[in-house]
Amino acid sequence: MGVNEPPKGVITETVTDVFEDSALGSTDIALEESNGHRNVNKSSSTDAENMRRMGREQELVRNFRMFSMASFAAMATAVWEFALFQITPALVDGGRPSLMYSTIWNFVGFLPIYLSMAEMASMAPIAGAQYHWVSEFAPRSMQRVLSYVSGWTSTLALQAGNALGVLLVGTLIQTIIVVNVENYSAPAWHASLLVIAAVMIAFTGSVIGYKVLHYWQNAAFAIHVMAYFAVLIPIWVNAPEATHAQVWKGFENTGNWNSIGLAVLIGQLPGISFQVGIDAAAHMSEEVRNASTAVPRAMLLTYALNFVLLFPMILTACYHLPDIQPALDDSTTYPFVYILKQSMAAGWVTLILVIIVIILIGSNITFLSATSRDLYAFARDDGVPFSGWLAQLSKRQQVPQNAAIVTCVISFLLALIYIGSDVAFYAITSLFTVALLQCYVLSIGCILWRRIAHPDTLPYAPFSLGQWGVPVNSAAVLYGTWSFFWAFWPQSYPVTAEGFNWASPLFMAAVFAALINYAIHGRKKYFGPVSLVEGRKNE
């Protein structure tokens, strides 16, 4: 079967396939099957054919449509909100120009990455995403071990990202207190308790409130956009401004590297981090109607919209930092809060931060949903301990509740680690960006290999790169590898335990542990998702 040929029996468009988003999410109507039974999972004929090809039963309910999934991905990444509290590394290494330019070049560099993943999500729209794609597209002799390692690193990355999201909520609540209470010291155990509360809220919204999750995504996205202007405009009106030369040419090397060029390349880590995570939509594929079309569109729409919101906000931050060092030394530890304090009274700063915290709580709910789907999918393929239990769905909500519980417990435990050492906590969660990049590069590298070696075995994709597949995939692998390399560098020189980027040893330890676990247990029961794929089962 060629990449441009639909499989036999697939109805590419019918009247019943056209399901539009309502004003607040997705229409909640069950379709009638041709045999008279209700289609409780809300699958279209194309969805059913895709699941049949991949050897899967439809267990989850397809409540999401394209626009509600784009809103979901935008909320999961919450790009301008998270970005404002991640800019410190770029200000230390390279200064304002480093932050500006790296935001632009990483947006451009990630385009082939998301085009490639959008195509794979169209070929195989499934919750496992990257590890499934590795299994389906890798060489036969290597697919089991490569997809197993990719499954572990993907799972660890999303677990780390989930913990980072709830921690930011906790520390921002402490920041609100610091702004209003002069003598508050913001002890770590307070943050940990706030993290636990944030995790419980996320679980409630993601699992207990799952049946209404898809309804409020578009409304949440609207708030996400309106709050953006509520933050942006007062800063431009009131905050002191830097000069054009400071913003575009005023490179700095506070990290003490031996050249400005090296400092700028090391300082691009925020620019890289701003771009990862949009593939959260791919992990929700089994809950999106007409997923092979809707998910790729949602990913690319989110990719574009995120930059439209992100770059003006980064521009705003850079133009309203006339002096970087006081911002880095601010008692809240967040340069952006320093900018807010220079542009408005404490009461307004508090209001802005409260709005951001509310949006981030919504982001935590969506990200927990994507993280639990990834763990559920890997457990379904016997990739983790206690797979049978983790792959179970709750009978009432019809969601992977057990996977969500484990995800919350992991965040609880990491919150306890934060009490003893914030360095240890950030060391573990630093896996988020590098592990995701590894999954991106490996899965795209596998489809590039198959596209060159066995193009006739690529499944049909409504969103296909066609003749541009090889150059786009190649560019994606190259840029993903480039980003992966720079994501390991520490923030300053000489390197200290506090300033060391622990992602490198922890990532290697995670890969080594996955290989050991595969050798002991995985090779006996993990066969890779391709073992179920139609036409590939006997390879």
Model region roles, listed by residue range:
Residues 190-248, 276, 299-303, 429-440, ...:
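Membrane-interface loop-to-helix entry segments
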Residues 126, 150-170, 275-287, 349-387, ...:
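Membrane-helix boundary/coupling elements in multi-pass transport proteins
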Residues 2-97, 115, 525-539:
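Membrane-interface "cap" regions at the ends of multi-pass membrane proteins
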Residues 190, 388-401, 440-505:
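C-terminal membrane-solvent junction of multi-pass transporters and transport-like membrane proteins
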Residues 132-143, 178-179, 254, 304-365, ...:
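TM-loop-TM module centered on a large, flexible mid-protein loop between adjacent transmembrane helices
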Residues 52-168, 272, 280-281, 285-288, ...:
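Transmembrane helix-boundary motif of multi-pass solute transporters/channels
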Residues 183-190, 218-344, 349:
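Helix-loop-helix junctions that connect adjacent transmembrane segments
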Residues 131-143, 166-193, 282-292, 297-303, ...:
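Helix-loop-helix connectors at the membrane interface of multi-pass transporters/channels
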